[in-house]
Amino acid sequence: MDGMTGDFRFGVNMVVPDSRAAWVEKCRKAEDLGYDVLSAADHLGMAPPFPALVLAGEVTSRVKLNTFVLNTPFYNPVLLARDVTGTDQFTDGRLELGLGAGYVKEEFEAAGMPFPSARERVDHLERTITELKRLYADPEHKPAPVRAGGPPLLLAGRGDRSLTLAAAHADIIGFTGTAKTPDGAAPAPASAEEIEERVEFVRAKLGGREAEFNLLCHFVNITDDRAGALAELAKLTRGVLSADQLAEVPTALIGSPAAVAEQLHAHRERFGLTYYTVLEHNMDQFAPVLEHLR
C-alpha cells in the first residue's frame, strides 16, 4: 500500500465543513499537497462520512478515502454493508473502511441509545466484521464490492481484545498512541515503551500475517526549535512525559521537516509504523515533510 512517499503513507483526518464548496476545496488541497489518504470522522454534529467521501471521490483522482473510524455500535451490519459497498462503487474502489468500537458515551445518549459496556461494544464490532465478510462473499449481495473481499479494513484500538480482533481481521491496524493527563483535561502521548508493548502484542497475534500499522498523530510541530517545542508540549500535557521522553514517541512529530523525516524512518524501524494520519489543522505545516520522503 505504498503511497507517493515510497515506504510510507500519510493521511489527513478532515473536519467536514458546512458547505459543499469548502469541502471540495479542502479535498483538492489535501491531494495537491501530496497526502495519500483523506479521512472523514464519524461523530454526531458532523457531516455523515459516506456522503462526504463520495463527494471527495468526485473531486479528487488519487487519494484513498477512509472512514476514520466508524462508531460501529451505531450501525446495523446489513445496512452498513450496503453503505460500504455503495460508497466503494461510487469511488471506484478507493474506499478504506475504518471501524472502531465506539467510546463517546454522550453520543449514545444524544442518539437515544444505551451505552453498552466495553465488552458489548467489541462484541458488536466482531459481529459486524463477520457479517460484512459474509455479505461481501455473497454473489447475490448488491451492490457488490469493487474487489473480492471488500475494501481494505482498518481496525483501531488500544485494549487487548480490540487489538486481537484487529490482528485476526484487519488489513490496517490503527494504534491510538494516547493516554490521559492526570486531571483528564487533555490527551497526552503514551510513552514509546507503552506503544512498543502494544505493537509487540499485535505482532505476536499476527503470527506472521502481514498488516499495515497506522498511527494517529495528535502532536505535530514543524519548527527549528525542537527542544523548545518539546519542553512546551511537556507543559501542555501536564508533565505526563518529560521532554526527553516525548522526543522518542511517534505521536509527537516535532522538528524541522528533515528532522521529522528522520524520526519517521527511526519509528518505522522500531515500531513498524508506515502509515500516519495527521489532524486537519496540521495538514499545511506537515506537508513539507512529505517532500523529504519522496
Task: Tell me what each language-model feature is.
Residues M1-R294:
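Active-site-adjacent structural elements that line small-molecule/cofactor binding pockets in enzymes
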